[in-house]
Amino acid sequence: MELLRGAALLLLLCAAACAQDSCTCTKNKRVTNCRLIDNVCHCNSIGSSVPVNCEILTSKCLLMKAEMANTKSGRREKPKDALQDTDGLYDPECENNGLFKAKQCNGTTCWCVNTAGVRRTDKHDTDLKCNQLVRTTWIIIEMRHAERKTPLNAESLTRYLKDTITSRYMLDGRYISGVVYENPTITIDLKQNSSDKTPGDVDITDVAYYFEKDVKDDSIFLNNKLNMNIDNEELKFDNMMVYYVDEVPPEFSMKSLTAGVIAVIVIVVLAIVAGIIGLVLSRRRKGKYVKAEMKEMNEMHRGLNA
């Protein structure tokens, strides 16, 4: 009997200790096995089990890997009226520090990426060499808000976005190089050179990913949806695009051009050829007219001389 009581007491003590050491990761809902270490919440990122510090933003690579793991297992939380959008989403390989590996592969197809995980080369076989992870130094975020009767107040909008980015995503304000409003388009520029970034600074690629998820109503934060209110009016968005500029130009060949770009090039070339043909035909017609006119004048002269 005493043995049973002792075992029960031990279980209660273990449960109490576990409850005391458990914690909640407010900055990343895609984690598991959360525990307190030196009064700081640490968890394991889903899909990789890499430990993350819940007081800072989780790296984009680990977030993408967790999202893919949730998608495969069917556990991904989907927002209301969600449509499937897999553009740009893949299962990445991450370093132990959470950064993207320079070389990413899907089976036997491989490519090189930047620090944002965006492909910057053509796709090759597994023999591809990616010598370094090229840093993304400039991120351009373009958003188009829903139709409004009146334009937004540009000053209020700029102040709100800068305050939100610095407080919610903990990005130093010096990395926000500009906010431009041209109704209905809002453009945010984030710039961060490797020489400017100091230890402890949040990376602009992580900030852009968190912000993009917030705007698209798929927040990474736990129970902390972003409600964008400008002058006490909720702001809705119809479209959002993110562009990445690296410190080294990308290495795409002509083969990688999209069908749309190729079509535009073909149309331009055809227009030039058509213009040249039209010019040649026009000159030929003009030449024939001049010859006919000269012939008539010569005949008139011969008639007068006769």
UniProtKB/Swiss-Prot annotation:
Disulphide bonds in the chain: C61-C94, C105-C110, C112-C130
Database matches in SMART domains: TY
Record topological domains on the Cytoplasmic side: 282-306
Localization, UniProt: Lateral cell membrane
Signal peptide start and end residues: 1-19
Family label: Belongs to the EPCAM family.
GO CC, any one term: bicellular tight junction
Span of domain Thyroglobulin type-1: 58-130
Topology relative to the membrane: Single-pass type I membrane protein
Intervals, Extracellular compartment: 20-260
Residue intervals passing through the bilayer: 261-281
Keyword ATP-binding: no
CDD domains tied to this protein: TY (cd00191)
Main location: membrane
Name the UniProt record assigns to this protein: Epithelial cell adhesion molecule
A molecular function (GO) term: cadherin binding involved in cell-cell adhesion
Keywords: Cell membrane, Disulfide bond, Glycoprotein, Membrane, Repeat, Signal, Transmembrane, Transmembrane helix
Domain of life: Eukaryota
Record keyword Iron present: no
Glycosylation sites: N106, N193
